[in-house]
Structure formats: C-alpha cells, structure tokens
Regions:
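N-terminal membrane-sensor/transducer module of prokaryotic signaling receptors
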Residues: 8, 12-177
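Hydrophobic heptad-repeat coiled-coil signature
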Residues: 1-7
Length: 177
C-alpha cells in the first residue's frame, strides 16, 4: 500500500539520517583527533628546531673558542720556529670567524643586545692587537716586550672565552650561526 511504502521510506530515510549523523559525529571526532595530533607534531617540531638550533649555536661557540686557542697557538709556534707568521700576515679582529659574526653576521643582528656581546669587542680586539705586538717585538728581537704582549694576549683571550661562554647559555646563542 501507499501508506506502507511511505512509512517504509520514512523509516529508511530516518535510519539514513541517523547513520549520516553518526558518521558526521565520527568524522568530527576524527578531525578533532587529527588536529590534536597535528598540533602535537608541530609542537614537537618546534622543540626539535630549538634543540638543533641550540646545538648548532653551542657548536659555533666551541669552534670560535677553538679558533682563539689556535690563533694563540700559531703565535706561540712562531716564537719557537714551527710557524712563520708575521705581524703583517696576522688576521685582524674583524677578519676572523668571530669578527665576521660580530661585525657583519648574525651576531650583530641577533645578539647585540646581550650584555656579554657588548663586552666581547674590546678583549677580542686586544687578542689580535697583542698577538701582532708580540710578533712585531719578536721581529725586532725585543723579547721583554714580546713576553708582555703574549701575557696580555692570553688575558684578553680568557676574557673572550668568558664572554662567549656567557652567551652560550642565553637565548641569543640559540640564533648564532
């Protein structure tokens, strides 16, 4: 009968609507869960970026510290005849890796507000100046002056290392590279 067909059709439609509603709820829940998982992945990715950035900046600082040890060592090796540096061939404080970072690179752009960054310039310049003075004194065979310059170079180098170490643990150092 027509009424039976209508009732059957209505019942079928009701079940289809209920099924569609349930599927919509499931899709909504699935969408919420997916969004939560994506947020968790984004957060984890951000943490990984920060960790990698911190490791890179720490590595950069360690390389810079090592550069200064090598710089000093090269000056000393010249004194004992294992190296042939001259005062004229010694790099300036703006030419070395740290100098480029400080004056031209990301250090200038991202770390100039850090107190240790501001304190770094003078001792870094002194390391290079005293190294040059020591080599000039060696060339002139003025060993007393050379010794004084070497002592001052070491003092300045210690200050540089101290300031780099201070920046290593700061927010600024996460951006170094």
């Amino acid at each position: 009968t027509l009424v039976g067909l209508i009732q059957s059709g209505s019942s079928d439609t009701k079940h289809q609507v209920q099924n569609a509603t349930e599927q919509a709820r499931q899709y909504q829940q699935s969408g919420i869960e997916t969004a939560d998982q994506v947020r968790a992945l984004v957060k984890m990715s951000e943490q990984m970026v920060n960790t990698i950035s911190m490791a890179a900046s720490t590595s950069f600082m360690e390389v810079v510290k090592l550069d200064h040890v090598v710089f000093n060592l090269d000056v000393y090796k010249t004194f004992i005849g294992y190296h042939t540096l001259t005062a004229d061939t010694l790099s300036t404080h703006t030419q070395c890796r740290l100098g480029k970072w400080y004056y031209e690179g990301r250090g200038r752009d991202e770390c100039r507000g850090h107190p240790a960054f501001a304190r770094l310039e003078a001792p870094h310049a002194r390391v290079h100046k005293q190294g040059k003075d020591a080599l000039e004194a060696l060339e002139q065979q003025d060993f007393a002056r050379a010794r004084t310059a070497l002592v001052e170079m070491e003092r300045a180098s210690d200050e540089v290392i101290t300031h780099l170490t201070e920046m290593e643990g700061s927010h600024c150092s996460h951006k170094i590279g």
